[in-house]
UniProtKB/Swiss-Prot annotation:
Gene Ontology process terms (BP): pantothenate biosynthetic process
Purpose of the protein: Catalyzes the condensation of pantoate with beta-alanine in an ATP-dependent reaction via a pantoyl-adenylate intermediate.
Protein's organism: Pseudomonas paraeruginosa (strain DSM 24068 / PA7)
Gene name of the record: panC
Positions of (R)-pantoate binding: Q61, Q155
InterPro entries found in the cross-reference section: Cyt_trans-like, Pantoate_ligase, Pantoate_ligase_C, Rossmann-like_a/b/a_fold
Family (UniProt): Belongs to the pantothenate synthetase family.
Identification of the protein by name: Pantothenate synthetase
Keyword match Ligase: yes
Keywords: ATP-binding, Cytoplasm, Ligase, Nucleotide-binding, Pantothenate biosynthesis
EC number, as in UniProt: 6.3.2.1
Length: 283
């Protein structure tokens, strides 16, 4: 596995791989990697011949009161994990490499519709930052395919629309959420939880599953279902940010009669905000 820091080095390495007839797979990350990231890299290796991973903690997607400064930087451990997972090329640019003219002057990309509401309401500007950095990375790497985890469901919807609307020549794959044995979705932010908070955290997925079971059983009063689920989260010691039933492509509010739904949740444990989701298929 080679590690490069500049766009010039990145493009040269990818060009060599492509000249050898290799199919390029790409997994963008912010580092502090866990088993969920490793699963994405391994899956990329199944779908492509040459796997590129980026590690870049993107300032554009953090709000002024968010955790940019304390977000863990664990490059040495990340490199070991990526080597084991089958990464061929690691791109670790600095802020100056990604935004050479500064962030204030950076052209930004807004993806309407799917960016609004949910995490978009709680984190103004977040998805603009995501769409901008993903657009830049896809243009830098120019992969045949890119993989993202379904845990960040709204982010995946934003990226799919971005790629579709801008006619970017890349296949986007969403991969299932990797979970701990107790159901908690793996996340870099789980490391912020103390022992008591970590014990309470699986209530998010448990509540989503219970809500999904009620919908599959035929319950159609979505407001009442959501009220019960919010109460369950609060009783478990969480502070809900949002809990919504949506249609999975457009992310419009789900209605009885929809055959495909996704339940999305964000909740706080102390100062740590966790997200999760559950797809519900009624066909």
């Amino acid at each position: 596995m080679n590690t490069v820091k500049t766009v010039r080095e990145l493009r040269a390495a990818v060009a060599r791989a492509r000249s050898e007839g290799k199919r390029i797979g790409f997994v963008p990350t912010m580092g502090n990697l866990h088993a969920g990231h490793a699963a994405l890299v391994k899956k990329a290796g199944e779908r492509a011949d040459f796997v590129v991973v980026s590690i870049f903690v993107n300032p554009l997607q953090f709000g002024p009161s968010e955790d940019l400064d304390k977000y863990p930087r664990t490059l040495a451990a990340d490199q070991e994990r990526l080597l084991e997972a089958g990464c061929h090329l690691l791109f670790t640019p600095g802020v100056e490499e990604m935004y050479p003219d500064g962030m204030d002057g950076q052209t930004r990309i807004h993806v309407p519709g799917v960016s609004e509401g949910l995490c978009g309401a709680s984190r103004p500007g977040h998805f603009e930052g995501v769409a901008t950095v993903v657009s830049k990375l896809l243009n830098m790497v120019q992969p045949d395919l890119a993989l993202f985890g379904e845990k960040d469901f709204q982010q995946l919807a934003v990226i799919r629309k971005l790629v579709r609307d801008l006619n970017l020549p890349v296949q986007i794959f969403g991969e299932p959420t990797v979970r701990a044995a107790d159901g908690l979705a793996l996340s870099s932010r789980n490391g912020y939880l103390d022992e008591q908070q970590r014990a309470a955290a699986p209530a998010i997925y448990r509540t989503l599953r219970q809500l999904g079971e009620r919908i599959r059983a035929g319950a159609e009063d979505f407001p009442a279902l959501l009220a019960d689920a919010r109460q369950a989260l609060e009783q478990a010691g969480l502070r809900p940010d949002y809990l919504e039933i949506r249609e999975p492509i457009s992310l419009r509010p789900g209605v009885p009669g929809d055959r495909q739904l996704v339940i999305l949740a964000a909740a706080y444990l102390g100062g740590t905000r966790l997200i999760d989701n559950l797809s519900v298929h009624l066909d």
